[in-house]
Every structure is written in structure tokens, then in C-alpha cells.
Amino acid sequence: MAFNFNWSPLTADANFYTRAQDLLTAALNKSPKPPIIVDDIIVTELNLGSIPPELEILEVGDLAEDRFRGIFKMSYSGDAFLTLKTRVQANPLNTYLLTRPSFASPLPLAAATPLTIPLQITLSDFKLSGFVVLVFSKQKGITVVFRNDPLESLKVSSTFDSIPFVRDFLQKEIEAQLRILFMDELPAIIHRLSLRLWVPEYRDGEQLETQDTASRTEGPGQDPLASPPQDPVDALGNALNESDIASLSLESSVETHSLFSQKNLLRLAALTDSQRTLSLFTPSIREVVYRAWTSPTDSGEATAGVISPASPALSRTHSQVGNISSFPDTASMVSSQTRSTTSTHSFSSYGLNTGSSRSKVHSRKRKKRVVDLRRPKTTDDAASVSDESAFTESTSAPSVYSAPLPIVREQPDDPVTPPLSPETGLHLPPVPERHRLSTSRPGIRRGADAFVQSGESSSSARRRSDVDVDATPRGTMRSHVAMTRCSEKPEPEAPQQLPSTILPFADEKASSNLVDQALVERLAGEIARRMRDEKMPGSSTCTPFWDRLNHDEAPPPAYGH
């Protein structure tokens, strides 16, 4: 089946070209343009040429007097051309800065000056090939749909043809825009043109819409800030009365626009300070305190109320001499006030332990050793021992403050003292008192002498006492305690005799004879301890725990020996 296209009426009708140019201009400016184009794209010239397209019928779906539906294969290589006119930005730095936020740009002055150049582009030598679905109806107009991209090539001629880079850039960008035009915009343009030609109702509706739009745009616009508000204030926030407002000229827009409503300013201030956050839409939650609400003064007062060394909430105020920087924990304060059981004193020791500079694991080991080696008399003493052990890491110093004896002459201002606790006498074996003195005290006496002579601060004295206590041989203490656990009752005279042994260590001077005697007694005690260990390796039934501690230093013998 052959068709003859009468192409001459399209080339001779001037009104057709005018309407087509308007539709093409609207279509080219509808989609977002690249930032290099700073003005509208105007179609100044359109010519379909004298060579018609070639159509090959592939399928006819519907054929009647007032309707037609078919699928065609179209190919076009004619002399049609299209001329566009616009303005472009020649300064690439200005184009780059326009596409970036203002707070992120360096804001150059001379280099960012815009430079717009008029541009004229002519599109010619179109080569099209594709499959077209054509539907015609007198009531609905013409509908053309491309099943594939019909654009094969075209020629772009512009003002910048002498610059190869600009020429290639324009060629690539215009080809991309034309592909979108053929697939999306051109079918809509053809459909509207057909409705104008064959559907009078559509034509009348467009005329009415155009008239309504023109009537709405006529006349001067109304300025909402032309009249002053009901409660005006000046630029400094001072309220203005009616006489001041009357003296102002309504013609001067600068003065009138500076009159802002006080109510609106208060609302804006409330929005800005909403929950003291950057977001104006932060949801409010009941019974919740936001971190932004707490000012530095409030947080400082709250911290000082809990961790101050002079705080009355802490029963042992000198236990925080080493380090005061800890987070405010109200639970530790409450527990230290009302502790009466073993559970409460462990909770308060946790609150104090968080402020120390030592790790929790290290403090927990020391705490366990102190609890295992002692049998506290009262609950308050036990709580004080656990509190002090988390800071001093000493097995003897805390009990001197928690349960002082009237015989001992100690200084109340001294935060740390090296003598051993009187309670340890309850667990010592029934050996003469001089053996206990010789086996476990030389290191402590040397630490006390050095502390009195040097006169250092409390922190340095604490470190020195820790080193001396750790230097005390643990083997002798473990053997004595193991024998004590096996015995039926502790020695009743130990608490009365032990304070007399503390007095020589509190003394500032010691004779050399005592040092020699202590060394001899230490050697004798060591020999006696080894003999007792050899005689009773497995005779006791309550020594597995202490044997395990001793075996940590020396491995046990093989089974069967």
C-alpha cells in the first residue's frame, strides 16, 4: 500500500509555524536547563524543508472514516532546520559557585564575576529512523508514540564553532536534550496541535483560560507589608505609638518594612529557643530532661554536690584525696548516707570506685583479698574497709581510720598510715608476738621512717606505703592464716597485745639493735614456717583454698609421691 504526502501546505502555512515555535519554546524551557544557560531558550526560526519523511506501513489496527490506528517505520533525511537563541555563562567559576551552597564557597570577587555571551544555535541535517505508532481521531486528535530513540545524528552550528571544546560540548548536550524531546515532548506537541485544528471545544477552552490568566495578572500587586502591623516595633525592638506611626511616610518602603510585629518576634524567638536545639521541630517528651537544657553552671553545681571532698553525704571525706574527677552519681551519695547492710556498703564502694584512677579489675582483686583476710567486728567497719581499699590498695591502712584504738597515737590529718589493722590479730596463729613482728613488719617500718623524714605530700606518701606493703612476704601471712583457720578459737589476748606492737612503728626513731633483732627473728620465723609446712601438707581439712594460693608460687608435686 502506497501513500502520497502533500508536504507543500505545511511549508506554506505561516500560522502553523508560529504555533509550532511557541510550543517548542515552551517545551525547551520546561525541563531544567544546565547552569551554563542563564536565559530562556527561544525558537527564532523553524522550517520543515521540502523533503517529506518516508513511511512504511507495518500494521493497520483500525481503519474508518474518522479514526485510524497503525504502526509505521519512519526514516527521514531532509533539509529541515531549527534555530535557537539564548545566553550562556562564559565564566566557568561563576557557574561552579552558583551550583554550590553559599557557606561552602570561597566567595571570590573578581574571578567570580559573571560574563554572559549571546548564543545562537542552528540544528540541521536531521537523520531519523524509528518505529512510530500513529493513532488518529477527529474527537481526540493525533497521537504519535516512538517505540525507540529515533535520532541518529544531526549537525549543530553555533557562535563558538571556532573553539573545539565548546563545539563538542554543545554537540553532546544538544543531542541529549533532543533525544528527550523526541521521546517525551514531541508527542505532546503534536497532540495539542491536532486538537487545535480539529476540536473546536479545545480551542475555545484555551482562549478562555488565556483571558482569565491575563485578567488576574492585570493591576498592581498588593504588598502585605505596605500597612504597619497592630503592635509595631522599630529595628531596636522599642514599641511605637500611633503618633510615631503617623509621622512615618507610607510611601517610604524602607521605614514601613522595618516595623515588625512584637508578637511575631516573640513567636520566632520561642521557636529559635525551642528546647535549645538546632531543630525547630524537636518533639517534646514529658518528664525528660534534655542535655541542651543543662547550662554549664547547673552541671557544675550538680557535680560539686556529689564529688566534693567536703561533702557531708560521704562518711569518709578523706578517701577522695587522690582523685576528685568523677561523674555525678546520686546513687552513691544515697547509699553512703543510709548504708547499714553489706549490700549497701558494696554499692557505695562502687560509687567511689568510679572516681578513682585505677581500673575496676585491679581494685576488685584487692577488695577480695581484704575481705578474705579479715573478720570485721561491725558493719560500719566493714563498709569503711571496702571503701578505703578501692583507693589505697592497702591491706592495713583503712582499718586504722575506721576503728581507731585509744592507745594508738595517730594524726587525724594523715590520709594514709602504714601500720597493720588490729583486726588481723584475730586470724594470726598462736605464735609469740615477736614472731609476727619479725615476719611481716620490716618493710612497713622502713616505709614509716621514710614518710616521717621526707615530709612529702599525701599522694606521694600513699604511693610509698603501697610499695612497702606489697613488699611484705605473703607466704608467711598465708601460712599463719591457714593454721588459724584450722584452730578452734583465736587467741583472746591478741586485741590487747597488738596495739603495743604498733607503737614502735609510729615512733620516729628506732635503734639499730631492734633492726638486728628483727632480722634474726625473721630468719627464725621463716625456718619455723618451712618446718610446719613440711609436717602438715595434707593433714588439715580446711586448707584447700590457702594451699591453692601457695601453689600459685610453686607447682604441686606429682601424684603418688
From Swiss-Prot:
Compositional bias (Polar residues): 314-329, 386-399
GO CC annotations on file: ERMES complex
Compartment(s) of residence: Mitochondrion outer membrane
InterPro entries reported for this sequence: Mdm34, SMP_LBD
GO BP, sorted A to Z: mitochondrial genome maintenance; mitochondrion organization; mitochondrion-endoplasmic reticulum membrane tethering; phospholipid transport
SMP-LTD domain location: 1-195
UniProt feature coiled coil, ranges: none
Protein name (database record): Mitochondrial distribution and morphology protein 34
